[in-house]
From Swiss-Prot:
UniProt xrefs under PANTHER family: ACETYL-COENZYME A CARBOXYLASE CARBOXYL TRANSFERASE SUBUNIT ALPHA, ACETYL-COENZYME A CARBOXYLASE CARBOXYL TRANSFERASE SUBUNIT ALPHA, CHLOROPLASTIC
Name of the molecule in the record: Acetyl-coenzyme A carboxylase carboxyl transferase subunit alpha
EC number: 2.1.3.15
Species the sequence originates in: Prochlorococcus marinus (strain MIT 9303)
Family: Belongs to the AccA family.
Lineage: Bacteria, Bacillati, Cyanobacteriota, Cyanophyceae, Synechococcales
Residue ranges the record marks as coiled coil: none
Cellular component GO terms held in the UniProt record: acetyl-CoA carboxylase complex
Length: 329
């Protein structure tokens, strides 16, 4: 059996999977009918996998969101986008590979698609800078969004980044300014914008393409102002407290839905999107088409106003005298 990437919390499934593989080998090498036994074990494994993934902690969801085989932006584009043409460059001398974009069709609709892109292995991750976009990447995204605005193409963005690249060169090139300009200009767009957190949505790197009329996220994706490791290091000077920070940050779909940050949490197959990527693609396509149907019926002033009000209404204010802080002691 080919070895697969395994989480610590998946270890209880290993023995079952080994038994299933042994029975499959027996069926291949003999004429013994083991279909009933195989069905029982596969059903049991599926049920246990579902139970495990329904009970994930925020820290465990982060692991799933970072799975190396989780479908990426280009994976989803290949699943449900026709006539995809990638567009390159920010017209200022940069073509950041950590952020990709282009035009294509979903059904009969022409759309612009932009998203962070990670790699599958070390070599590709280095080329893609681990999905951490530079100022050139965000300026490329803005150039493409201006193109979509000019030609009235709906914009779809896919968020999957630990954060914007924080290297010295990125700061010298104006990382903060590039993201800030994107935030400002995305509020002014005259076309529908749908953003989806497909993996991890970290800090300003996620926000740089995240101002949208609809913000969706997958069930085991995370969306956070800072990584739990960074938060723990800042608050407690101890990165080992990352699990506590993950719980306090409210980074999961249900928490963000209740806070009004996201509009819909998309279900994932038991085991996560890496377990059944085509199924995940079908779920995402259906959601995108459904929300586009709603948004394309709005006038420009309605789009802009609802986008503005959506962000103004996010979150809630806690009473300073209240003990409800969300932070562990």
């Amino acid at each position: 059996m080919a070895r697969r990437y395994l989480f610590e919390f998946e270890k209880p499934l290993v023995e079952l999977e080994q038994q299933i593989e042994q029975i499959r080998e027996l069926a291949r090498d003999s004429e013994v009918d083991v279909s009933q036994q195989l069905l029982q074990l596969e059903t049991l494994a599926a049920r246990r996998r579902e139970e495990i993934f329904q009970a994930l902690t925020p820290a465990e969801k982060i692991q799933v969101a970072r799975h190396p085989h989780r479908p990426s932006t280009l994976d989803f584009i290949q699943m449900f986008c026709d006539d995809w043409v990638e567009l390159h460059g920010d017209r200022r001398g940069s073509d950041d590979q950590a952020l990709v974009g282009g035009v294509g069709r979903i059904g009969k609709r022409s759309v612009l698609l932009i998203g962070h892109q990670k790699g599958r292995d070390t070599k590709e991750n280095v080329a893609r800078n681990f999905g951490m976009a530079t100022p050139g990447g965000y300026r490329k995204a803005l150039r493409l969004m201006d193109h979509a605005d000019r030609f009235r193409l709906p914009i779809l963005t896919f968020i999957d980044t630990p954060g914007a690249y924080a290297g010295l060169l990125a700061e010298e090139q104006g990382q903060g300014e590039a993201i800030a300009v994107n935030l400002r200009e995305m509020f002014r767009l005259r076309v529908p914008v749908i953003a989806t957190v497909i993996g991890e949505g970290g800090s300003g790197g996620a926000l740089g393409i995240g101002v949208a009329d609809r913000l969706l996220m997958f069930e085991h994706s995370v969306y956070t102002v800072a990584s739990p490791e960074a938060c723990a290091s800042i608050l407690w000077r101890d990165a080992a407290k990352a699990p506590e920070a993950a719980a306090a940050l409210k980074i999961t779909g249900p928490d963000l839905l209740s806070l009004g940050v996201v509009d819909e949490v998309l279900p994932e197959p038991a085991g996560g999107n890496n377990w059944a990527p085509l199924q995940a693609g079908e779920v995402l396509r259906e959601a995108i088409e459904r929300h586009l149907d709603d948004l394309l019926g709005l006038k420009v002033n309605q789009l802009r106003e609802s986008r503005y009000r959506k962000f103004r209404a996010m979150g809630r204010v806690l009473d300073p005298s209240s003990s409800e802080t969300g932070l562990p002691a």
